[in-house]
Amino acid sequence: IPQSETKIIERLGRYFATLKPGINVIIPFIDHAKDIVSMRNGRYVYTNSIDLREQVYDFDRQNVITKDNIQMQINALLYFQIVDPFKSVYEINNLPNAIEKLTQTTLRNIIGEMELDQTLTSRDTINTKLRAVLDDATNKWGIKVNRVELQDITPPESVLQAMEKQMQAERNKRATILTSEGEKEKQRLLSEGEKA
């Protein structure tokens, strides 16, 4: 077994051992490695070895609704590690699918408690909350969630246009204030020049 991998061995259909990296001996036809579902290159595959290194799941964009009923799309990355191979095989049937569904529903719940402005400015808060909830929920599956990163938060086009108009209005306001302050300073200097 290669370094950083392990295998679950069943003897006559029952759990027998968790094999560690290196040379291991099993009895042919009586012992066999348990097949598990894993995700490789964005696809579910069956394999009989469990990767103990940190893994990254890049989830597809999903639609979420904020507290103020604005629909937006969010893309998330999840960094996790299998710390208990036995639990990851026998406590959950399809680990990658379960992690994906749990991440999606938890993300929807967290975003549903926030308004649009909070969502756009609180990535770190969302990441921290999401990681804490996922780590707690996946602990019984033998998983340690190390990090969660929101890659992209995309509000609807109408909201983006409104934000652009608001930024343009803010820039125009600042330009008007600077122009009027310049005129005021010009008048003050002219009046001082006339007095002198």
Residue map of PLM features:
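Peptidyl-prolyl cis-trans isomerase
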Residues: 186-189
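N-terminal hydrophobic membrane-entry segments
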Residues: 1-173, 177-179, 192
